[in-house]
Amino acid sequence: MPVLQIRKIGDPVLRSKAKPVTEITKKTLSLIDNMVETMYQAEGVGLAAPQVGVSKRIIVVDTGEGQGLIELINPEIIETEGKDIMEEGCLSVPGQTGKVIRASKVTVKGLNRGGKEVRIRAEGFLARAFQHEIDHLNGILFIDKVVRIGEEMI
């Protein structure tokens, strides 16, 4: 599987709303496989299709916390609870981190690679990863939500 080029801040695809996947084809599955390979190669915990230049609503996530690899097509957050603040970074914004407020718990629904609807209740780091990757599908980068860089308010 080829490792895909990760698009960096400034690339217009990162600021565009991704299009829903209307049919899961061999090409879709190949893209997912290549995204997974790219995420692991880059030592990331999540990757959205726009980050590899494809304007489709697909994310892959593996936080390394034991839940394993999660692949979602057309994911959406259907419920949130609580709030917390945590430092984030992004493969598309290399060398930058910042504190971002996000929901501490989320319920996400989407399709798995077989086209079956799944719902995942997540909290902590996994909830944060889902929110971060789904933001990418809406043209939003974590830097748009940063509340603190270092100790200075922005």
UniProtKB/Swiss-Prot annotation:
Active site residues of this protein: 133
Cofactor: Fe(2+)
The EC number(s) this enzyme carries: 3.5.1.88
Keywords: Hydrolase, Iron, Metal-binding, Protein biosynthesis
Catalytic reaction(s) noted: N-terminal N-formyl-L-methionyl-[peptide] + H2O = N-terminal L-methionyl-[peptide] + formate
Gene Ontology terms, MF aspect: metal ion binding; peptide deformylase activity
InterPro entries: Peptide_deformylase, Peptide_deformylase_sf
Residues holding Fe cation: 90, 132, 136
UniProt keyword tRNA-binding, yes or no: no
Alphabetized CDD domains for the sequence: Pep_deformylase
Function: Removes the formyl group from the N-terminal Met of newly synthesized proteins. Requires at least a dipeptide for an efficient rate of reaction. N-terminal L-methionine is a prerequisite for activity but the enzyme has broad specificity at other positions.
Family, per entry: Belongs to the polypeptide deformylase family.
Name of the protein described by the UniProt record: Peptide deformylase
Species, as recorded: Halothermothrix orenii (strain H 168 / OCM 544 / DSM 9562)
Lineage: Bacteria, Bacillati, Bacillota, Clostridia, Halanaerobiales
Gene that encodes it: def
